[in-house]
Structure formats: C-alpha cells, structure tokens
Amino acid sequence: MKVIVDTSVWIEYLKNRPSVTELIDRYLLTGKAYTVGPVIAELLQGAKTEEDYKTLNSNIGGLPFIETNLDDWILAGKLSFKLRKRGITIPITDCIIAALAINHNAAVMSFDRHFQSIPDLRLETAPK
C-alpha cells in the first residue's frame, strides 16, 4: 500500500527521532513512502539554509511522486466544503493531500490530528 508521508512526519524524520526514522526508513526501502506537491513545497519552504534547501531538494527527487490532476483538485474542494459545513476548517493543502490519498488508493501518515476528520481517508499510524 502507498503511504503519503506528511510534512509533520518528515520534520521528525529529519530531526532523527528514532521511532520515526526506523519506520520511514523501512517504508523507503520497500517503496511504500510517497510524496506529493504540497509536502515538497512545505519541506522546502522550511529549509534553514541554502545548503539544507539543496539537500532536501536533491533527496525529495528520489521519492515516488503522486501527480495532482483535475479530479484531485475537485475532491479537495469538495472535502473542504463539506468539512466547513460541519464547522471544521482544515488547511487546503491538507485537503489536497487527503484528496490525492483517496483518489490514488493511498493512506496518509501525519501527526496532524485534523486528518482524522476527513471521511474516507485511510490513515497510517505515525510512530510515537
């Protein structure tokens, strides 16, 4: 199964948090870890130095990538619309990540709890 690793998990991975690095390294070796545009943009924007930016950019390029298509954008809007009707506001970038997971038969691994509010989204448990 494909797992879209969210930015919150990658941040802990880059901090060398043992429980996270162990699991993500296993996913990387087995080809389960995938990335998407919003995660790449968030990681790159958070780089502290030019050198960090270059390293991140180089390493991200080696991950399996799920492209965003029109159906994904439409589903992201629909998810956001339905959640807001229930009084739940989630960043549109996370709605896009959820839409990509739903439309492309993947799960999402994240430390962000708001993903739990999204119907039909499979979640992969992030390590403690």
Residue spans for each PLM region:
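Acidic, PIN/NYN-like endoribonuclease modules and their adjacent C-terminal/linker elements
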Residues: 1-2, 98, 102-128
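Short, well-structured N-terminal submotif of metal-dependent ribonuclease cores
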Residues: 1-35, 44-58, 128
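Acidic active-site catalytic centers that drive phospho-/nucleotidyl reactions
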Residues: 6, 94, 112
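Generic structural signal for small/hydrophobic residues in well-ordered secondary structure
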Residues: 6-7, 43, 76, 101
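Alpha-helical structural signal
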Residues: 10, 24, 40, 93-98
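Residues at secondary-structure transition points
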Residues: 18, 30, 34, 38, ...
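Active-site neighborhoods of divalent-metal-dependent phosphate/nucleic-acid chemistry enzymes
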Residues: 63-109
